[in-house]
């Protein structure tokens, strides 16, 4: 689906999806009922109603498999952001064991990494433009500064080792969210859902072509199911795009500038 649709608020996305689906169902109803005369009417009625359950099951399976894939990607994106935020928070806390100057330098680099991620990384991920070739320069610099620290005692040596691990964990989580941001429901999958839904709507219209009211009711009910399925998949299809997307709120909570150094 187009970026313009996926970036709409969910309410407007629902309006577009439901309107398009109902328009398609109405078109099928009009075409089939107009064609259902004389020999064609008998041919339409020869279509076995037993076809409808298999078609409905196939549509449900397609939707189910794609929905599971989409929602798994969304959950993985949330976990990646939470892991990155947790690792960066560990760096900030462990930096407190070192002198103020070194602590402030590391905190400033962590803040800069988060600000770049929020202000540049998230918009780029929403457009699926951020790639692994974009290096986290602030995080790399924080790792270099951490490795250059001269521990004065065992506690600082342990803190330095844990900080290195936390920075590596943050970098790995960043890579994960970038990879996940590239995920999307492919054109073939969208085409499969739409074609399966179209075939089912046509079959419903043909089976009920001799009773226009029953035909209209059946088409409306199934079209509603199609629209709802498409809406749910579209709303979650890109983890970092649209109104329902993974936000950088957890990362923002790690920013140290302007925050008290300890709990009240």
Region locations from a protein language model:
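Alpha-helical transmembrane anchor segments
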Residues: 6-26, 30-36, 179-264
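Membrane-interface segments at loop-to-transmembrane junctions
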Residues: 40-51
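Structured inter-helical modules in multipass membrane proteins
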Residues: 90-182
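Short extracytoplasmic/periplasmic juxtamembrane "stem" segments immediately C-terminal to an N-terminal membrane anchor
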Residues: 80-97, 247-261
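A generic, lipid-embedded transmembrane alpha helix
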Residues: 49-66
């Amino acid at each position: 689906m187009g970026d313009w649709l996926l970036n709409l608020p969910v309410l407007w996305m629902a309006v577009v999806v439901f309107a398009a689906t109902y328009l398609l169902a109405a078109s099928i109803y009009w075409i089939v009922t107009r064609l259902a005369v004389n020999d064609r009417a008998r041919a339409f009625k020869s279509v076995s109603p037993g076809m409808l359950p298999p078609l409905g099951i196939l549509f449900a399976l397609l939707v189910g498999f794609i929905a599971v894939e989409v929602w798994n990607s969304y959950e993985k994106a949330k976990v990646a952001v939470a892991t990155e935020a947790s690792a960066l928070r560990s760096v900030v806390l462990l930096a407190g064991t070192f002198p103020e100057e070194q602590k402030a330098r590391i905190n400033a680099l962590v803040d800069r990494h988060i600000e770049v991620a929020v202000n540049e990384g998230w918009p780029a991920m929403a457009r699926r433009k951020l790639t692994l070739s974009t290096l986290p320069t602030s995080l790399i610099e924080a790792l270099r500064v951490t490795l250059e620290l001269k521990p004065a005692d065992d506690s600082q040596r342990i803190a330095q080792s844990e900080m290195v691990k936390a920075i590596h964990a943050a970098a790995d989580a960043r890579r994960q969210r970038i990879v996940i941001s590239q995920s999307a429901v492919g054109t073939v999958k969208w085409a499969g859902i739409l074609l399966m839904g179209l075939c089912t709507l046509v079959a419903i219209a043909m089976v009920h072509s001799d009773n226009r009211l029953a035909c209209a009711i059946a088409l409306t009910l199934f079209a509603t199911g199609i629209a709802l399925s498409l809406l749910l998949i579209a709303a979650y299809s890109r983890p970092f795009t649209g109104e329902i997307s993974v936000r950088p709120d957890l990362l923002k909570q790690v920013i140290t500038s302007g925050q008290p150094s300890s709990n009240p």
